[in-house]
Amino acid sequence: MNLAWKEIKFYKFRFILIMFIIFLMAIMVLFISGLAQGLARENISIFDQIKGNQFVVQKMKEPQLEKSILSRSKQDNISKIIDEKPFKMAGKTFKINGNEENVMAINSVKNHQPNLKSGHYPKNGNQIAINEKLTAEGLYLDDKVKVKGDDTTYKVVGILKNTMYSHSNIVMMDQSKIEQSSNVATFYVTNQLSKSDKNKINHIKGVQTATTDDITSNIASYKAEQTPLDMMIISLYIITAIVLSAFFYVMTIQKTSEIGILKAIGITTKHLLTSLILQISMITFIGVAIAEVVIFLISQILPVSMPFHIDMHNIIIVLVVFMIVGLIGTSLSFIKLIKIDPIEAIGGGQ
């Protein structure tokens, strides 16, 4: 540890430069990760909010909430098995400040209500609660809004916390207003579903159970967006490994004579390798930690309309992966350090 720290202090500029490169790479990875998570949440954040992991929907090859049509008789049969009220979902078009905004309207179901950021849930047919992203369009608490094809003027009484589905803002309104739409989807959400109940539901003609993963995997925009973004993140990790490999290999070559002298006076190869690993770990940790602080501060000032989300889970993953990538990227330096002959390094072999 002492040797590693002394070398960092002696070659300050070199190590600051490497740390700056790591910082920039970490910023890029974290920002793209934040965008990937933000876009993902615009597709599936509703599932975090409605507090359920089992769904009862219309039987179809690729279950989708907005396409689940359940007749009254099917709903009656389902209600005999599970003690849950159904969700109703329909597309609506809001008129906001002269612009049209497509949203997905859902009703309020006890124990499965999305979390509120402010205000309260609708209490009558003239009240609505909107997703927080709609505030970026100029819609706030106590504002009035019209819906295309509906004469009712709705009052905004609540702001829902990050509730979206398939890139559509979720708006909570009275069930009777949703059922006025031409295409109304119906589905059930539950936390507890025994094997026996699941079998009973699946035996109802035209009805099936599905998990959250089943639903999310069939959201077209979710699949289309995540794959290229994940590939970009992996590519950045590979580039980071290559850059660190080049930096540390060149530095090891430049220090050949010093390493030879250290070996000649009795410093073991194991000690030198430990010193190199500590150097890599320290500068990688510091560079990534600074990048994470910067990204966190940036995330606090980004507008609500920006699809960006970073949490502690992402931060820890990026830090761990960078530490591993840093060590992998400097494997060439390990090989070079092991092969350095002290006599040749100090010119004794001439």
Swiss-Prot record:
The complex is composed of two ATP-binding proteins (HrtA), two transmembrane proteins (HrtB) and a solute-binding protein. Pfam families: FtsX (PF02687). This is Putative hemin transport system permease protein HrtB. Belongs to the ABC-4 integral membrane protein family. HrtB subfamily. It is a multi-pass membrane protein. The chain crosses the membrane at residues 15-35, 233-253, 276-296, 315-335. The keyword Lyase does not apply. Part of the ABC transporter complex hrt involved in hemin import. Responsible for the translocation of the substrate across the membrane. It comes from the Bacteria. Keywords: Cell membrane, Membrane, Transmembrane, Transmembrane helix, Transport. It is found in: Cell membrane. InterPro entries: ABC-4/HrtB_transporter, ABC3_permease_C. One of its GO terms (cellular component) is plasma membrane. The gene is hrtB.
